[in-house]
């Protein structure tokens, strides 16, 4: 079986509500979608972060896949090992799009689910985290935000069955602390997290962390910039620290462990360059006694299915993962169903999802008119 063609599409899909963080507010997601075709008729689908800049890299890398077997992924990764050096996150994202498409094709060719190809299931359902941002209380005065967001979060967790909640933090450290206190008061039993995306200084991270110790947070994610800063915070705060910003490649792992900077590392198939690297990260975390979770970059159904397969086959990934999937107003696959705050791991061949090509074309046309929504 040889790859004969690679199709690349860039799509814009709306969110149900605006989503805000310490560095952006967005109303939709732009994603790059890939299809590989083979001489046997088997096809594989992939999806990755961002839009046209990543799609341009994907098209360059795709030239190296033509004539190769989808099973020859190790050779493909070795050939592209310098791509992240030149393109950073964009390079990892581009490699991952093709990587996932090849895994999907391998599963379809063998009649096996991606979970089975990765070692078999260790869980059949994956719990998601309810993501809370200040945009969930539009027009509310700052003084009233804690109460408004607590009411919103209580409603979301009750209706959706979520057992974990993450607040997207901002540069308003005191305001974030006040919101978290109110969230804990109405949700005493959920796993509670906060992620300022490194918007806080080291001193502010220490002060906020000490103030938050009484709330029994599951972890504090990327309060400040860098491994050195995180290590200073961890030395003074009795809350586990998590990162998806200072350990973003394997070269970062050793210094983070040596300096005692983190307790939990967020992996991501699309930020780490594919499925095998994400599984390798899990092995690193288990070896050094660290926790692991999965980051969300706005995955649609194809990318979500890949994350579910990784979680479904990886014992260390036992926490409720971050996922924006339930926040999208539509999808380009037959939708995955959220039940009791969880998604079931697909069991069909490959990714186990079916792409709606009419919707794919529609949302590609939206991108052609509007340009990229997320960069």
Residue ranges of each PLM-predicted region?
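Metal-dependent enolase-superfamily TIM-barrel catalytic cores that perform enediolate-based chemistry
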Residues: 119-236
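Metal- or metallocofactor-binding catalytic centers and their adjacent structured scaffolds
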Residues: 37-110
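C-terminal extensions of enzymes
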Residues: 330-375
């Amino acid at each position: 079986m040889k790859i004969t063609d690679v199709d690349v599409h860039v799509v814009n899909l709306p969110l149900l509500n605006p989503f805000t963080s310490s560095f952006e507010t967005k109303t939709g997601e732009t994603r790059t979608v890939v299809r590989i075709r083979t001489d046997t008729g088997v096809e594989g689908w992939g999806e990755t972060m961002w839009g046209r800049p990543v799609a341009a890299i994907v098209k360059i890398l795709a030239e190296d896949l033509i004539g190769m077997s989808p099973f020859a992924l190790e050779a493909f990764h070795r050939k592209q090992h310098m791509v992240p050096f030149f393109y950073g996150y964009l390079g990892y994202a581009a490699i991952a799009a093709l990587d996932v498409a090849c895994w999907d094709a391998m599963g379809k060719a063998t009649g096996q689910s991606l979970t089975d190809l990765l070692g078999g299931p260790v869980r059949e359902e994956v719990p998601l985290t309810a993501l809370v941002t200040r945009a969930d209380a539009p027009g509310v005065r700052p003084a009233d935000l804690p109460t408004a967001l607590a009411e919103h979060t209580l409603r979301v967790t009750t209706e959706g069955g979520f057992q974990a909640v993450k607040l997207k933090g901002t540069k308003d450290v005191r305001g974030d602390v006040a919101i978290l206190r109110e969230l804990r008061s109405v949700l005493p039993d959920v796993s509670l997290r906060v992620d300022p995306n490194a918007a806080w200084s080291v001193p502010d991270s220490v002060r906020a962390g000490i103030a938050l110790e009484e709330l029994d947070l599951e972890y504090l994610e990327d309060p400040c910039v860098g491994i050195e800063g995180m290590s200073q915070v961890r030395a003074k705060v009795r809350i586990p620290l998590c990162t998806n910003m200072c350990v973003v490649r394997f070269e970062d792992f050793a210094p983070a462990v040596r300096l005692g900077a983190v307790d939990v590392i967020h992996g991501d198939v699309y930020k780490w360059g594919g499925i095998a690297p994400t599984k390798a990260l899990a092995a690193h975390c288990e070896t050094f006694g660290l926790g692991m979770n999965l980051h969300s970059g706005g995955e649609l159904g194809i990318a979500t299915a890949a994350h579910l397969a990784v979680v479904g086959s990886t014992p260390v990934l036992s926490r409720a993962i971050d996922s924006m999937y339930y926040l999208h107003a539509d999808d380009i696959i037959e939708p995955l169903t959220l039940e009791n705050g969880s998604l079931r791991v697909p069991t069909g061949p490959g990714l186990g999802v079916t792409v709606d090509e009419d919707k794919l074309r529609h949302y590609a046309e939206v991108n052609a008119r509007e340009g990229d929504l997320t960069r």
